[in-house]
Amino acid sequence: MKANLRKLIGTAVLGLAMFSNDIPAWAGQRLLTEVTVGTSSASGTMLGARYSTDKQQYIGCWLYENRSEEFIGCAAQDKTGKSFICYSRDPRWVTVVKAMTDSSYISVEANANGPCTSLTIENHSSHLR
């Protein structure tokens, strides 16, 4: 019985060793930054919001384009329900929003009356799933 068990374990280890090159290794820093909303700013990651334990958080930006105009908007809500929204017609930020992924870290600031004044997107390996 012991011999059969040893043979089975040996075969299993050999099999795992042979196929281990095909198994991806996930390493490195991983941050699931939750959403924070201040009086005139918001920051966080979409993944952090999505995988948070509450059902309140969201963050993201969108782009509206047609033949005559384009503008961006960003919105966020933290775990307490505090929300933030801003918009901009600044054409430089269209490129920034287009570079955004579901793993991007987003930091956005706005004036009190709504226009975005700063938009930072950080695409970094620590923000990947």
Where are these regions (language model features)?
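Bacterial N-terminal signal peptides
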Residues: G10-S20
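Sec/Tat signal peptide C-region and signal peptidase I cleavage site
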Residues: F19-A27
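Beta-strand/loop nucleic-acid-binding surfaces
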Residues: K82-T95
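OB-fold/S1-family single-stranded nucleic acid-binding modules
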Residues: N113-R129
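Short aromatic-glycine-enriched beta-strand elements
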Residues: S68-C74
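Short, surface-exposed binding/anchoring microloops in extracellular/periplasmic proteins
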Residues: G28-S68
